[in-house]
Curated annotation (Swiss-Prot):
A motif (Subfamily I CxxC motif) lies at residues 7-10. It comes from the Archaea. This is Damage-control phosphatase AF_1104. Keywords: Hydrolase, Manganese, Metal-binding, Nickel. Metal-dependent phosphatase with probable damage-control functions. Could hydrolyze oxidatively damaged purine nucleotides or their biosynthetic intermediates. GO terms for molecular function: hydrolase activity; metal ion binding. It comes from Archaeoglobus fulgidus (strain ATCC 49558 / DSM 4304 / JCM 9628 / NBRC 100126 / VC-16). Its cofactor is [2Fe-2S] cluster; Mn(2+); Ni(2+). Its EC number is 3.1.3.-. A motif (Subfamily I GNFE-like motif) lies at residues 247-250.
Amino acid sequence: MKISPLCPSCLLGRVYYEAKLVTDDEDLISQCVDESLKILAENYSSRPINAHLATRIHRRVYEILGVEDPYAEVKARANEVARQVLPLAKEIVEGSDDPFKTAVIVSIVGNNFDYGVQGHKVVEEEFRDFLKRKVQEGLKINDTERIKELSSGKVVYLTDNAGEIFFDTLLMKEIKRRCEKLTAVVRGRPIISDATIEDARLARVDKIADELLTNGKGAIGIIMDELPDETRKALEEADLIVAKGMANYECLSDGSLKPIAFLLTAKCEPVARDIGVNVGDMVAKVVE
């Protein structure tokens, strides 16, 4: 998915958000915005994939701020909220008529742990009620039966956010019961609110998946040229790729890797429009 005219304002908003997480120095924040504008000006006209451009911008901002992980406290908070709500989520999945479908929905509800997205608020304090309400609301696009059918061979699960990854474990367990091999992939370095190896271990993903890999240098989503050989091989040999979140959708929706199950909450207009849903809708869409 190529960058939309709406994307730059959101990117700059997120730059400001993450800079404010670590400093009140207006000159330093302005430098972050200035550098981001330069990168946008140099690259926007070529219509790159938004997540690829965002990766370049956030890496530069981190350099300016001199901080490895501006979102560290935010991610820790998300993980703690998710850890506390996970027993309820497990109860909802296990008590449903279709645990696989419900685990898909719960994992997508977890996709709301996405900080700094323009117009999107993470409801930490009321997440229990939010979870129950969204499960009742259900999916706008529901390809869960096809996802279940495709989960028999080698499955690669591309994670997205910290916090969210706790809810992913419920779906991973459902997939693990059916598949030949389950590989989970996280970010190789801290980038925005995305899950890294540390978050995966905290959520005990390493105890569920047969293999825990990274996307290399910590890109937002997937940049094929940055993938470690073992991750690229796993993706190329997968019978199903489960791709969580909007960044993975942006990176892979026009690519050749298939079949892919895109599981996400459409949190912005460009992604919602590209999929054909409304902002706020939950999507489980298979592309073959």
